[in-house]
């Protein structure tokens, strides 16, 4: 865009903009933030602002759009939520006293990963910023929630692990080091393809603060990636960040591992269809009362434990809460009064906490003595929890003594400090409180002296104090004593020496009062800041109690039981239930099922009609495992479980078409991940693997995968299939057992699903019945029934296994005995691509198949 001859202000703007080319520059001009040039054009569109121009009459006017400074935060949030960055440029000196161009500078760069919440809401969502560093054929990851101070780091083997971890954390912005290795690996492009905002850091400095925050880290590359992240934060935030907690390393091996596909397949934190929390497992189990508790619950759900002792510690507290119903209820009543302590502490550290947030902090801290009292009335573990909670009544008392209960949002306009807290403020307030009395007396005296009964003493922001008389009475005023200040249509306004002096005293008292109140507010906020570590420790303890009490609520409300963990590698679940599906159905409608895989059973082959409940059965096992290992009770009458290290799933058809992958490719990729990564301590759930390709290929691959898992992996596996021929594998492999989902036909031929898992294979799949239930045309159903009858009358396609041939394989196919007509029919079936076929095309194909049969 062509530019006009630049004014000093625009020179200053362009210098700043050149440093932040990828950000919207909010340039402070008086009471407004201005956007210029391309920022103004795009900003006006995104924010629905009026687009104007600077130097409108010039050949090249400069586009501009303005935002009132008091409303800027709303507009900033809109831009950042859309993935943009915003550089805030403030006036660094008073324009009234500045010589020449007012100095301005960027005071903060707000990005998707550094956006802060106010701390006054009930936000149960973390906002993580991460850095990734590739070194030595591994990936080092560090992430931080700037709004809470949480800082963690880990080492990952593969880039796919990085993607899974970033997805689990719901990271929006990634910081990368500008170096050759990062560039050569194309990491920026790979991450950008997934919708992440990419930021880069060139300089990496290790100052005293960085050294302190990375000191706990042993691995050099973990310290380096954390240093990159911290440098980016310090460069963009330009403020005190004393709330950041020294970095903690974590090992993924310490937690039950599962990838994004599994999280999606199981609806763990969001419903796969609606993308909302409602309808997910998290939505069901979140009965937390605080924002910190909500965030911690989600972290526990996404990182179930593998240490039995740690799991049982959580279960012990839940059980104690179950046994102490009234204690739990009273505790939760107190928790409802607790605001977001983590984020309030962070805002105090960063110097952004206002007076209202101080009051929120006071109310939160004031709830702690009640919580301690309630817990101490119990015995054992809850009593011990009471002793760990720190009573911070000293800080709450200071805030209560100093700050009014309902302060204004602004901290610079006074009315924040309580009467009686400070003698100077009381003195100034006394002067101000006498103002109205003094003005009333002046008005009375002036009326008596002038004889003008309509004379009034008034005040407004533009002219201050003045005496107003009607124009008809101006002649009654004593000459030389009254100084004209303003002429109106029907009146004149004057000031007197006494009124001028009074205004000076009032303004001085007002100014000194607000300055003194601000000074005291900052002092109190600094006292809060000095207690950051105490507040953060207290916040963690309160969050844990909130989560455990919430899980006790969930257990009571949903008939969950405490699981038992064993080293015997068995799964023994009595009347297990899918908690989310059960919650949707009417009471008593959900059909519970046992899940039994003993030491001699590694795999269940599950057959039965579509819609009968195979997928639900598989999902409920995974959810019970995850709930149990996160330290929660589980939906069953009883549950004995091993400790799993990983869960692999292929359930549903969440095709990655956007990444150019078909259903079958996704199936094979997910199967390969399990084959390569699973151990004997893993859980594998494969739902109808092989359906995405031709029948023979799919069946052959399914059998090969089953036998590979049995021979080499030995993981506990649920494998559902519509290939009924595969059920013969149970006769060959002792660790494979057949089960099926029951269904019965009534006398009229109508199909009824029992939703019960029964021993042995299903006798048939009832696919045509399911098609009829789906509403396919009667003519089509009749044709399909005829075709099926004809196929079933043909010679068996899968004879009994023979000793000859594939000595270690179950012979699924013996096509040498198939007559030519049937072979032609098979070839035609193999050529059909049902995923792209329209209903009309399906009818035509069925008609053609019927002709081939005749």
UniProtKB/Swiss-Prot annotation:
Upper taxonomic lineage: Bacteria, Bacillati, Bacillota, Bacilli, Lactobacillales
Keywords annotated in UniProt: ATP-binding, DNA damage, DNA repair, DNA-binding, Nucleotide-binding
InterPro entries, per the entry: DNA_mismatch_repair_MutS, DNA_mismatch_repair_MutS-lik_N, DNA_mismatch_repair_MutS/MSH, DNA_mismatch_repair_MutS_C, DNA_mismatch_repair_MutS_clamp, DNA_mismatch_repair_MutS_core, DNA_mismatch_repair_MutS_N, DNA_mismatch_repair_MutS_sf
Pfam family, one: MutS_IV
GO molecular function, one term: mismatched DNA binding
Residues at which ATP binds: 608-615
Keyword Magnesium among record annotations: no
Organism of provenance: Leuconostoc mesenteroides subsp. mesenteroides (strain ATCC 8293 / DSM 20343 / BCRC 11652 / CCM 1803 / JCM 6124 / NCDO 523 / NBRC 100496 / NCIMB 8023 / NCTC 12954 / NRRL B-1118 / 37Y)
SMART domains to which the protein is assigned, alphabetical: MUTSac, MUTSd
Family of this protein: Belongs to the DNA mismatch repair MutS family.
Stated role: This protein is involved in the repair of mismatches in DNA. It is possible that it carries out the mismatch recognition step. This protein has a weak ATPase activity.
HAMAP family named among the record's database cross-references: MutS
The encoding gene: mutS
GO biological process, one term: mismatch repair
The organism's place on the tree of life at top rank: Bacteria
Protein name: DNA mismatch repair protein MutS
Gene Ontology CC terms, in alphabetical order: cytosol
